[in-house]
């Protein structure tokens, strides 16, 4: 039985999950929910099923794999990663995984707050001012490694790729001063299964966010 990934028909919190499912060659199908247009942003497609799926904390995204029913995007990522030994092996690697997992979520939330705000134009200016410093930290953390944890890819590389690509859409020059990050993005995109997936109609680079967002909703 293929796994079922449920989420809105956007990129959002499912991007790294979809990429990891593709990279690992996992058998899965998607249930994509559509949100209505303004001003109501009707969510009935999702709400009509929300409490009928047997989820402990009903939310999107969710992953159903037989008797395993999982919500929270990072919990889903870790579940898939454990099946394929992509969580780091040594204690040092696991520490780096944990740090980057949480740092990526922080940055993702910061950008989302800007993009969902009615004060987007004002907040964008402030965000762009601090962006080089934030990107520099990612560059330093990667260093000369092939992947963020070492020479072997782990699930946090999928999170890091998502974050960096999001910011390239937000500000296309943001990685210009950081060649190791540009190389990382290029290295990730030429992975055989990732490259193949990106050429399919199933691949969603955009919309980044739901229709409620001020920016990134198309």
Curated annotation (Swiss-Prot):
Organism of provenance: Mus musculus (Mouse)
Protein's name in the database: Glutathione S-transferase Mu 4
GO cellular component term of the entry, any: cytosol
Similarity-based family: Belongs to the GST superfamily. Mu family.
InterPro entries recorded: Glutathione-S-Trfase_C-like (IPR010987), Glutathione-S-Trfase_C_sf (IPR036282), Glutathione_S-Trfase_N (IPR004045), GST_C (IPR004046), GST_mu (IPR003081), GST_superfamily (IPR050213), Thioredoxin-like_sf (IPR036249)
GO biological process: one example: xenobiotic catabolic process
Main location: cytoplasm
Subunit composition and interactions: Homodimer.
Lineage summary: Eukaryota, Metazoa, Chordata, Craniata, Vertebrata
């Amino acid at each position: 039985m293929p796994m079922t990934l449920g989420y809105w028909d956007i990129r959002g919190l499912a991007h790294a999950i979809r990429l990891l499912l593709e990279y690992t060659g996992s058998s899965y199908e998607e249930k994509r929910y559509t949100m209505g247009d303004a001003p109501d942003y009707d969510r009935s497609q999702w709400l009509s099923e929300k409490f009928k799926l047997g989820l402990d904390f009903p939310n999107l995204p969710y992953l159903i794999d037989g008797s395993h029913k999982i919500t929270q995007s990072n919990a889903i990522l870790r579940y898939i990663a454990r099946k394929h030994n992509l969580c780091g092996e040594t204690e040092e690697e696991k520490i780096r995984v944990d740090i980057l997992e949480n740092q990526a979520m922080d940055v993702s939330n910061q950008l989302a707050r800007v993009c969902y705000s009615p004060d987007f134009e004002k907040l964008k200016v402030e965000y762009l001012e601090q962006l080089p410093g934030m990107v520099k930290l990612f560059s330093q953390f990667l260093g000369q490694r092939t992947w963020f944890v070492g020479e072997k890819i782990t699930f946090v590389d999928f999170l890091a790729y998502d974050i960096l690509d999001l910011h390239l859409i937000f500000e296309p020059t943001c990685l210009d001063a950081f060649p190791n990050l540009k190389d990382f993005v290029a290295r990730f995109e030429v992975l055989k299964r990732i490259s193949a997936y990106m050429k399919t109609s199933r691949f969603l680079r955009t919309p980044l966010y739901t229709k409620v967002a001020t920016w990134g909703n198309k």
